[in-house]
Regions:
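Conserved active-site segment of CheY-like receiver
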Residues: 11, 81-85, 104-106
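Two-component/phosphorelay signaling modules centered on CheY-like receiver
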Residues: 12-31
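Residue-level signal for the "D+5" position in two-component response regulator receiver
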Residues: 32, 57-60
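Acidic, metal-coordinating helix/loop segments flanking the phosphotransfer/catalytic sites
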Residues: 32-50
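Acidic catalytic/metal-coordinating carboxylates
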Residues: 35, 61-64
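The feature encodes the CheY-like receiver
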Residues: 53, 58, 82
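Short amphipathic alpha-helix used as the core "switch/output" element in two-component signaling
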Residues: 63-75
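Short, flexible helix-to-coil linker/hinge segments that flank and couple to helix-turn-helix
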Residues: 90-95, 100-132
Length: 132
């Protein structure tokens, strides 16, 4: 079975490395970027199945990048990876077209499930997110 192609957008190098290490076993990590503009460019060159995106990227935020990709009918599914444990952020993420919302502190348990569900067209939010 073909591994899902995942692109990681995270501006903190240590977190980016941890995400790649976590995902490399079961997914084809086709690239990493550290800002929203680079994410928009990389989507077209790497054609990922799923994007794992930090909500607070520099240059263009993750929310803004997701909104742009949604308007462009980008086929890649989006999973946000964030420290923001707040219902308003979750709503903004879903409004921008994301199917997944994973807290960084739950990454090892929640991110693989969120990626798989997003690829299947299903929503996933870390269970510990408040008031959703």
């Amino acid at each position: 079975m073909k591994k899902l192609r995942v692109l990681v957008a995270e501006d903190h190098a240590a977190v980016r490395s941890s995400v790649v290490r976590l995902l490399s076993k079961n997914y084809d990590v086709v690239g990493t970027v550290n800002d929203g503009r680079a994410l928009l460019e990389a989507v077209h060159t790497s054609e990922p199945d799923v994007l794992v995106v930090d909500l607070s990227l520099p240059v263009i935020t993750g929310i803004e990048a997701a909104s742009i990709l949604k308007k462009m009918d980008c086929p890649s599914k989006i999973v946000f990876l964030t420290v923001h444990n707040d219902a308003d952020f979750v709503r903004a993420a879903h409004d921008a077209g994301a199917l997944g919302y994973v807290l960084k502190q739950q990454m090892t348990t929640d991110l693989p499930e969120a990626i798989d569900k997003a690829f299947a067209g299903e929503q996933f939010t870390s269970p510990s997110v408040r008031d959703v």
